[in-house]
Amino acid sequence: MMRIGLFLLTNLAVLVVAGIILSLFGVGSYHGAGGLNLGNLLVICFVFGMVGSLISLLMSKWMAKKTTGTEIIDPNAPRNQAEAWLLQTVAELSQRAGIQMPEVGIFPSYQSNAFATGWNKNDALVSVSTGLMERMNKDELRAVLAHEIGHVANGDMVTLALIQGVVNAFVMFFARVVGDFIDRNVFGRQDGEAPGMGYFAITIVLDIVFGILASAIVMWFSRHREYRADEAGARLAGKQAMISALLRLQAESEMPDQMPKEMKAFAIAEGKEQGFSLAALFQTHPSIEQRVAALQQLNCP
């Protein structure tokens, strides 16, 4: 579940860069003597928004490895029984889920956590923390792996990219509409005059502000997909094992979160936040209680 935080951070960076390029080199295609050409602007923003989101998606696996320090297990030469068991279990779950074997890795973290990412379901990465390996029994660990395989099989990252691309398009569109309004009514730009530096500065700031606010839509999808991944984990590894794994994660919820901020939404668990906490609209996960309650209603062994 760390996958979305990384995706959002990368996407925001790409969105800002795309916005700068659009403002500097594309302004003439939607800004004329009569003001904004809203049709042209919407098309251009849609193209830039989708491209930015797809770049984030394509970079997600590489950035996940670098950000978490994930070390990939050589499928032909596991170094110990634990690594061999991980490879065997992921291979079995992947086959049952109907996807190709993903890369399997381990990242250093005392906190029990895991994530899956990748640009498509047949080119994915599943990684677990050292803390997860040390403190969960095999049934619980298998359930966590099944949960992550569920994310991959459900195509969550691709769906996220499509949602984020549409969100990006509207963020860039409204940033430029509002920026044009401010440039005319606050900075006094007259009809026929080219946008000045004030317009460019405003649109870049609005890209960031609107991008953060619009992430609430993506966070809603993140919360929704956790239930689906929990269900997949329960069907692949057993409902009680999935519930047991979640309850163990809940027992560690008072631990400070060691996951890099940009990876939190990719993780299966979030530790206790230190200091200010964002509103519920920006939470990447439902509560453990909500997830367990949903699993208990599930009709499966």
Curated annotation (Swiss-Prot):
Keywords: Cell inner membrane, Cell membrane, Hydrolase, Membrane, Metal-binding, Metalloprotease, Protease, Stress response, Transmembrane, Transmembrane helix, Zinc. Its cofactor is Zn(2+). It is a multi-pass membrane protein. Zn(2+) binds at residues 147, 151, 226. The keyword RNA-binding does not apply. The lineage of its organism: Bacteria, Pseudomonadati, Pseudomonadota, Gammaproteobacteria, Moraxellales. It is found in: Cell inner membrane. This is Protease HtpX. GO terms for molecular function: metalloendopeptidase activity; zinc ion binding. The gene is htpX. Its EC number is 3.4.24.-. The keyword Cell inner membrane applies. It comes from the Bacteria. Binds 1 zinc ion per subunit. The active site is at residue 148. Pfam families: Peptidase_M48 (PF01435). GO terms for cellular component: plasma membrane. The chain crosses the membrane at residues 4-24, 38-58, 155-175, 200-220. InterPro entries: HtpX_protease (IPR050083), Pept_M48_protease_HtpX (IPR022919), Peptidase_M48 (IPR001915). GO terms for biological process: proteolysis. Belongs to the peptidase M48B family.
